[in-house]
Curated annotation (Swiss-Prot):
Family recorded in the similarity comment: Belongs to the eukaryotic ribosomal protein eL40 family.
HAMAP family with a match to the protein in the record: Ribosomal_eL40
Parts forming coiled coils: none
InterPro entries per the UniProt record, alphabetical: Ribosomal_eL40_arc, Ribosomal_eL40_dom, Ribosomal_eL40_sf, Ribosomal_zn-bd
Lineage: Archaea, Methanobacteriati, Methanobacteriota, Methanomada group, Methanococci
Disulfide bridge map: none
Organism name: Methanococcus vannielii (strain ATCC 35089 / DSM 1224 / JCM 13029 / OCM 148 / SB)
Pfam families: Ribosomal_L40e
NCBIfam families cross-referenced by the UniProt entry: PRK04136.1 (NF003161)
Name this polypeptide is given: Large ribosomal subunit protein eL40
GO molecular function, one term: structural constituent of ribosome
Length: 47
């Protein structure tokens, strides 16, 4: 169960598409630049 908790802590973030800042999962807009286009953090590594 601890592994699932770690996964949740690491990946339950939103990334700003403008400045790449990490934001909380509940965020509506970026904490650094105020941009509202946030994506979920990628769970799979890109090739």
């Amino acid at each position: 169960m601890a592994f699932e908790e770690a996964i949740k802590r690491v990946f339950m973030k939103r990334i700003c598409m403008k400045c790449n800042a990490r934001n909380s999962w509940k965020a509506e807009k970026c904490r650094k630049c105020g941009y509202s286009n946030l994506r979920p953090k990628a769970k799979e590594a890109r090739a």
